[in-house]
């Protein structure tokens, strides 16, 4: 269990308290971000309502391993991998075959499914992104789409795995990208398996499809 490695997602409750500062509190993007944070705080309150010790242990293991609560709910429901929502469906996969691969100095590789518009997020800025995380075989081990809400974190600040951090830093709002993350930039201690979720071996490569929905701070400045 990768308890000492960077968590996959930053808890939105703490993010909204410390980082969602904007010049326009009535901005639609700002309000949306506050709703996202509120939803996550409500999810955390469900810990006290778990019906059994086994459910409580499952939740604790999932959170410490960097998994979203929504993912655990989907796995517990026995949702088959092929029925899980994806950012890149069959037609997208075919088109991706003709997209050139970009390789960075760190070894990260990526293909742009869709190039966004505007500036890339500066280091330390809040970003709202959807993602689908997979092992090389294509099996999903975590996904924000299963809850239907994007996640917020400070990009470039070590709040997510290194490959995801680096991959998003050069994206633009509205963009969508597939990241081929090598082991050293992924999960050094791996992730344990769970019902409906494959094991991620230590220092093994993973694939992330990422959609950068918006950048709250830049959005408020533009308005």
From Swiss-Prot:
Residues 1-36, 37-76 form a transit peptide. GO terms for molecular function: peptidyl-prolyl cis-trans isomerase activity. It comes from the Eukaryota. Residues 124-216 form the PPIase FKBP-type domain. Keywords: Chloroplast, Isomerase, Plastid, Rotamase, Thylakoid, Transit peptide. Its main location: plastid. It is found in: Plastid, Chloroplast thylakoid lumen. Its EC number is 5.2.1.8. Pfam families: FKBP_C. Belongs to the FKBP-type PPIase family. This is Peptidyl-prolyl cis-trans isomerase FKBP16-3, chloroplastic. It comes from Arabidopsis thaliana.
């Amino acid at each position: 269990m990768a308890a000492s490695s960077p968590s996959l997602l930053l808890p939105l409750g703490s993010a909204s308290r410390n980082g969602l500062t904007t010049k326009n509190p009535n901005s639609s993007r700002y309000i949306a971000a506050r709703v996202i944070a509120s939803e996550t705080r409500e999810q955390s309150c469900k810990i006290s309502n778990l019906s059994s010790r086994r459910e409580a242990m499952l939740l604790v293991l999932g959170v410490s391993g960097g998994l979203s609560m929504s993912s655990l709910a989907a796995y517990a429901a026995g949702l088959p991998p092929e029925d899980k929502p994806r950012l890149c469906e069959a037609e997208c996969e075919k088109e991706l075959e003709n997209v050139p691969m970009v390789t960075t100095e760190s070894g990260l590789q990526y293909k742009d499914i869709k190039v966004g518009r505007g500036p890339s997020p500066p280091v330390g800025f809040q970003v709202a992104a959807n993602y689908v995380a997979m092992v090389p075989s294509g099996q999903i081990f975590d996904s924000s789409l299963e809850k239907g809400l994007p996640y917020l974190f400070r990009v470039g600040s070590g709040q997510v795995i290194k490959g995801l951090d680096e991959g998003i830093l050069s994206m633009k709002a509205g963009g969508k990208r597939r990241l081929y993350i090598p082991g050293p930039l992924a999960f050094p201690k791996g992730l344990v398996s769970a019902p409906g979720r494959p094991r991620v071996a230590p220092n093994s490569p993973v694939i992330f499809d990422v959609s950068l929905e918006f950048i709250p701070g830049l959005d408020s400045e533009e308005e």
